[in-house]
Amino acid sequence: MNTPKNYKVGYKLFEMREDGKLFPLFISKGKETPMNEWLPAENNPTKGYAARPGWHISMTTPDAPHLRGYDGSDLGPYKSRFKNGKRVWCEVLYNTTIDYRDEVSKLPKKCFTDKSPTNGWYLFNEGNRSTWAISDAIKVTRILTEEERQDILRQMNYDEVSAFGPYKKAFEKRKKIA
């Protein structure tokens, strides 16, 4: 795939095997995501997940409080599929050549459900959770160290504890019900 005309920097959480290979967390989780090459999105409907084809990217912060574990860690409620595997934040480039925000804002679900954006991107807001970019192509440029991730969050005055607060309350409420 050729380099898009326009692109931006974002962040994406991956699962990394002990050998350093990256894999998506949920959709197409068995397919390796190589670094330093432009990768087109695929439409792979997956049971239990809403149909929103495309690469999902955090635009500004390497944090996703809705994917954290009950204790607030990046481990989430899932154990690694891989022996000695772990979740890692990566810096990515994502295609922004064509902006589909106006088009998807008129759709019933405010997103494409049958295709990824063609040569572009749009924003998706999932209620009170978060807003992320959905693009037809990404390029993973580097794996962030935890120190680099924390530096980015500090520069943005981003408070992980506050961001996780609503999710922590929801987790605690669910634990009381269970």
Task: Identify the function of each model-found stretch.
Residues 56:
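Histidine-centered active-site/metal-ligand motif
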Residues 1-34, 48-52, 64-178:
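Conserved NAD+-utilizing ADP-ribose enzyme module
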